[in-house]
A protein has these predicted regions:
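Terminal, contiguous helix-loop blocks that mediate binding/assembly
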Residues: 2-477
Length: 477
């Protein structure tokens, strides 16, 4: 049986209490909801494991050198370190939970990566079938099936006996399970925790006419999910599948050369996953940068995002990544070229238009609807100089697109590891995203009359829907 730590500090005399190992920050748990959330979360976790020097297929400690490397990179933020129990090889436990009503996605990942998810069933919560693309059904079944069948708090405690610093939560917003379960979970965390836990959500808006969603019900699902994010999420980051797909297609040749969690799935199960490989790789890169901004040795904490966004309207951010796709030999021992991990390399990517906003936003909306209080947060991982000249260069990049004042720009410098390429992710908070969301809200309002009985039998009344709709319209107007 794998042992557990009862506090964030290792026991006296244990192998982990080395003078060279810093006191790690409190853990962060990734909870992935629905088919989309599980795929994106698994890809992000693979990236994070590489970040801290662990094998993404089988994270273990074999030697004291392995231990030092992972600890110095704050691997305990995303990995649970069990005590030794006889074997020379100690599995490192990902602090990740895969949750879905349909058991297929979570079980496929679990079966395909038995050496990654060492706690087996403790990494998975699933029901007996999907939520029929119905947010109200998913919310009701979260209570009836998930809370009744599983003690969710015990599952979280198994992944992190230590006090939890925060939760990162990827999911799709247009479907039934991901949208509703993410909503219910963040409500559960915020109403059942006495600790100041920070919740960060990563919601993917569907591409209508491409993704397998039902247009009318999806707009209702998105509105209700957005309302819950407004109420319970401290840092809400939005992606557009349309933009992710376009960027993945544009960078198809590069993506083919980048290893992915999907590469190791059984060939007969690639349908439904392979088409999203590039999209997940692009989004996962920005989520990993978000986590690195507070998991590595920086002057920034996860809770700072709460303070940044709490007074904003809308209190949402969209990611801008430079580059869209990392170098092909990322985390390799020999990084190609001399500029790939410097600011000079970053600016070259911008010049070649190898950067990209990951949200479907119109240039006219940026000019017409951007607000005077728009702001942004630069997450910067580069080697070498990052002083006045480098900051001014990034400011100019942003000002070419958004009217953001210098005083409303935040810079977070992230330590870069050996073998890592440079990376800049800019989280942009702007009123210019309002028109896209308000368009969806308008469609949801028109669709409600036809769907009110179907949603009503699962507990979503017209009064509750209209209140949610009004809250979302107010937030994004």
């Amino acid at each position: 049986m794998i042992g557990s730590l009862k506090s964030s500090q290792p026991k006296k005399g244990s192998d982990l209490s080395k003078a060279s190992a810093p006191l790690p920050p409190a853990p962060v748990i990734m909870t992935c909801f629905g088919h989309c959330g599980i795929g994106l979360g698994a890809e992000t976790y693979r990236r994070l494991l590489l970040d801290v020097g662990a094998d993404p297929l089988k994270p273990t400690i074999k030697t004291s050198k392995d231990e030092d490397r992972v600890l110095k990179r704050y691997g305990s933020t995303i990995l649970r370190f069990p005590q030794k129990y006889g074997s020379e090889e100690i599995p490192l436990i990902p602090r990740a939970l895969l949750i879905d009503l349909d058991p297929r996605a979570a079980n496929l990942i679990l079966q395909s990566y038995p050496d990654l998810f060492a706690l087996r069933e403790k990494h998975v919560i699933h029901g007996s079938g999907g939520a029929a693309r119905n947010w109200a059904e998913g919310r009701t079944r979260f209570t009836q099936e998930m809370k009744a069948k599983y003690d969710i708090q015990n599952q979280l405690d198994a992944l992190s006996p230590e006090p939890v610093r925060g939760y990162t939560i990827p999911f799709a917003m247009g479907g039934g399970t991901g949208s509703s379960f993410a909503s219910s979970f963040i409500e559960f965390i915020k109403t059942n925790s006495s600790d100041p836990t920070t919740v960060a959500t990563f919601g993917l808006l569907p591409e209508f006419g491409w993704d397998p969603v039902i247009f009318e019900s999806a707009t209702i699902n998105i509105v209700m999910n957005l309302e819950y994010q407004v109420k319970y999420s401290d840092c809400s980051i939005l992606f557009s599948n349309k933009v992710l797909r376009e960027l993945a297609h544009k960078n198809e040749k590069k993506i083919q050369k980048i290893p992915s969690i999907i590469d190791d799935l059984p060939k007969e199960h690639e349908v439904g996953w392979k088409d999203y490989k590039g999209m997940n790789l692009i989004a996962a890169n920005s989520i990993a940068m978000f986590i690195a901004s507070f998991a590595r040795e920086t002057e920034w904490d996860m809770s700072n995002y709460r303070t940044w966004l709490t007074t904003k309207r809308p209190k949402f951010a969209i990611p801008w990544v430079i580059p869209v796709i990392p170098e092909e030999n990322q985390w390799g021992k020999e990084l190609l070229g001399g500029k790939n991990n410097t600011m000079e390399g970053i600016m070259e990517k911008v010049g070649k238009k190898e950067d990209g906003l990951l949200f479907d936003i119109d240039e006219n909306d940026i000019r017409s609807h951007g607000g005077e209080k728009d702001s942004c947060c630069f997450l910067v991982k580069v080697k070498g100089e990052f002083d006045l000249k480098e900051r001014e260069a990034l400011k100019r990049v942003v000002k070419d697109k958004f009217n953001i004042q210098d005083s409303r720009m935040i810079f977070v410098k992230i330590p870069i590891m050996e073998g890592e390429p440079a990376n800049v992710t800019i989280l942009v908070n702007t009123k210019a995203i309002g028109p896209k969301i308000l368009e969806i809200a308008s469609e949801a309002e028109e669709s409600w009359t036809a769907y009110k009985d179907e949603y009503g039998k699962w507990g979503l009344s017209t009064e509750e829907f209209k209140k949610g709709l009004m809250d979302v319209v107010h937030q994004f107007s």
